[in-house]
């Protein structure tokens, strides 16, 4: 299976190339200035977007407004805001889509599968029967580690 390409949309941010001068520059980050049609809600620290390539109906992203690549570079206030927005997004998805469960995921760094280097948390609604056997969840990232319940080793 080939990886899907990441949609990139230029946005305008400001850079300070020399003391006191502010110049607009193009940013290829799709989360810094997202398509307004994808923004579900936001506050000063985070925005919640519908995913551009949804895994399932209701797939949502929680994104810090500040451009930061790693969750571990976010401030405590941003981390708190991400968790609060995740809970609110879940309430909204529950109302609209009525899923049977959720996967919450964060790929931090290219080695972990992060393709857009702006921190974002996935809220992926799951539905009974969407996979024949959903056990293992995120463990399927490394297939040889996934079916731990079938192994004899401790």
Please describe what each predicted stretch is.
Residues 2, 8-154:
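HIT superfamily nucleotide-processing domains
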């Amino acid at each position: 299976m080939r990886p899907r390409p990441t949609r990139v949309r230029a946005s305008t941010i400001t850079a300070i190339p020399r003391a006191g001068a502010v110049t607009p520059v193009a940013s290829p980050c799709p989360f810094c200035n997202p398509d307004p049609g994808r923004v579900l809600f936001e506050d000063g620290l985070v925005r919640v977007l519908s995913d551009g390539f949804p895994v399932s109906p209701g797939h949502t992203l929680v994104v810090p407004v500040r451009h930061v690549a790693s969750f571990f570079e976010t401030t405590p206030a941003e981390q708190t805001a991400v968790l609060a927005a995740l809970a609110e997004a879940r309430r909204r998805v529950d109302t609209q889509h009525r899923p049977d469960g959720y996967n919450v995921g964060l790929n931090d760094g290219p080695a972990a599968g992060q393709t857009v280097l702006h921190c974002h948390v996935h809220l992926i609604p799951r539905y009974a029967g969407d996979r024949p056997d959903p056990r293992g969840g995120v463990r399927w990232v490394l297939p040889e580690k996934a079916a731990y319940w079938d192994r004899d080793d401790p």
